[in-house]
């Protein structure tokens, strides 16, 4: 009994019994501590999740948006991470893509994201956005711009198109004079073999894939096994027929090729810079009626005959036509400033075909506000369907071969002089309006919300997406 009583007294006399508030205080502190611990854990989880989202890229964040909020819906593009032998190793070995006759090493042209050396410092008339850009650098330029494309995704299932950054033109340049056709064709065959093994190929058998070639179509359409035959067979491979090709000149009979402009010398950083240039050339004093910059070509085919006649007529109209003979080294046809000054001083710029139907000069002259004069429908009208208007008479002059050869020694001058001045002014303004769509702006171009000016890259990407969406609707319907 004593022990029980003692025990009973002990419990009753315990401090918690004497002071009930002490127990309540202890329990309150314990609850607060547990709550703080939970909040701390939640914060750690929140921080970790935020960091993970940031490192997965913009595409991951956008994938959680509703379709109404996602401005990239239908515009997502996935870039294949190709083995380096298809791009980086080609330009790393830049000496191999330089030909003996090249006045400047191709290594120099790879500077500044493929834009080449700066030329702005040579003349106050040209801003730091002017470069000595080589006509064959489009593959590198397009790849660099694609890396900054606003709707890239690392999730290929979200992509409306798959970009294949293979430098086909530069690769061909390495093997330009090799008589071993197997060596010339090797990379193209290896590429399609690699593509077919990727899960992205299975979705549409490659019909949602596209790539850019910085050379004309003919260079990839060798249909002979002869060692003396020109080019590679890349575009004729069965898998290649499913791809969409963007080339500086397309085959007019091809169903999967689309021509996009040659790169010019101007690569602006912002819309105001483009507008400023347009205003400058509107006010330019044009003292020459027409001009031609180029070299003589053999008269073995009609293209050579046309060019020979154009040069002859320009020389015979020496008071109204300026001829920059690119066969003469002293004329500096490789100097962008010399060419631009010629085109800026001319009302019309003659664009006869040469080695092929198209010329880089077409876009350099448009950049200068000079009205192009064509002698073949395939030099522009049937080529650049996404970039130039269908109504060709609004911005250019077309002279048929028959008119050229049977109209007398000054037929070109006669036709151009006969165009009313009011029409010339309107044509020039239409040419100037084309400028934003024929230049490749810098990859890091300042493009604020509400930007309405599209550059050549923007127009090309839009065209690719629309084409692939059309194929998806027509050939891959799901009920």
Swiss-Prot record:
It is a single-pass type II membrane protein. Expressed in roots, hypocotyls, cotyledons, leaves, stems and sepals. Residues 41-479 are lumenal. Its EC number is 2.4.1.-. It comes from the Eukaryota. Coiled coil: none annotated. It is found in: Golgi apparatus membrane. Glycans are attached at residues 155, 242, 285, 391. It is an enzyme of class 2 (transferase). One of its GO terms (molecular function) is glycosyltransferase activity. Its main location: Golgi. GO terms for biological process: protein glycosylation. Belongs to the glycosyltransferase 47 family. This is Probable xyloglucan galactosyltransferase GT15. It comes from Arabidopsis thaliana. The gene is GT15.
């Amino acid at each position: 009994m004593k022990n029980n009583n003692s025990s009973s007294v002990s419990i009753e006399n315990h401090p918690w019994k004497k002071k009930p508030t002490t127990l309540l205080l202890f329990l309150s502190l314990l609850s607060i501590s547990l709550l703080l611990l939970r909040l701390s854990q939640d914060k750690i989880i929140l921080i970790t999740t935020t960091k993970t989202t940031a490192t997965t890229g913009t595409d991951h964040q956008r994938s959680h948006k509703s379709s109404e909020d996602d401005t990239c819906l239908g515009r997502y593009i996935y870039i294949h991470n190709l083995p380096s032998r298809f791009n980086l190793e080609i330009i790393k070995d830049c000496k191999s893509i330089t030909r003996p006759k090249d006045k400047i090493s191709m290594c120099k042209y790879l500077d500044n994201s493929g834009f080449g050396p700066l030329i702005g410092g040579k003349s106050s008339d040209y801003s730091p956005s002017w470069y000595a850009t080589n006509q064959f650098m489009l593959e590198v330029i397009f790849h660099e711009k694609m890396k900054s494309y606003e709707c890239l995704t690392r999730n290929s299932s979200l992509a409306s198109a798959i970009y294949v950054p293979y430098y086909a033109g530069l690769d061909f340049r390495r093997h330009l004079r090799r008589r071993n056709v197997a060596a010339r064709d090797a990379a193209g065959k290896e590429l399609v073999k690699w593509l077919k093994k990727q899960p992205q190929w299975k979705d549409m058998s490659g019909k949602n894939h596209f790539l850019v070639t910085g050379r004309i179509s003919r260079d990839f359409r060798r249909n002979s096994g002869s060692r003396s035959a020109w080019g590679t067979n890349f575009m004729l491979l069965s898998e290649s027929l499913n791809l969409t090709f963007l080339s500086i000149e397309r085959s007019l009979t091809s169903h999967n090729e689309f021509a996009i402009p040659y790169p010019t010398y101007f690569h602006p950083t912002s819309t105001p810079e483009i507008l400023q240039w347009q205003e400058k050339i509107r006010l330019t004093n044009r003292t020459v009626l027409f001009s031609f910059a180029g070299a003589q070509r053999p008269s073995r085919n009609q293209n050579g005959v046309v060019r020979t006649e154009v040069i002859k007529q320009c020389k015979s109209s020496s008071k109204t036509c300026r001829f920059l003979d690119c066969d003469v080294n002293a004329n500096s046809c490789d100097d962008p400033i010399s060419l631009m000054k010629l085109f800026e001083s001319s009302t019309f710029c003659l664009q006869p075909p040469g080695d092929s139907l198209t010329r880089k000069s077409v876009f350099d002259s448009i950049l200068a506000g000079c009205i192009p004069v064509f002698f073949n429908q395939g030099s522009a009208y049937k080529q650049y369907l996404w970039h130039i208007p269908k109504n060709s008479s609004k911005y250019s002059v077309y002279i048929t071969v028959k008119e050229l050869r049977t109209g007398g020694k000054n037929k070109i001058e006669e036709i151009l002089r006969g165009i009313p001045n009011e029409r010339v002014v309107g044509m020039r303004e239409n040419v100037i309006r084309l400028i934003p769509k024929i230049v490749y702006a810098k990859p890091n171009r300042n493009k604020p919300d509400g930007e309405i000016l599209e550059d050549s890259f923007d127009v090309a990407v839009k065209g690719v997406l629309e084409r692939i969406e059309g194929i998806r609707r027509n050939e891959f319907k799901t009920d």
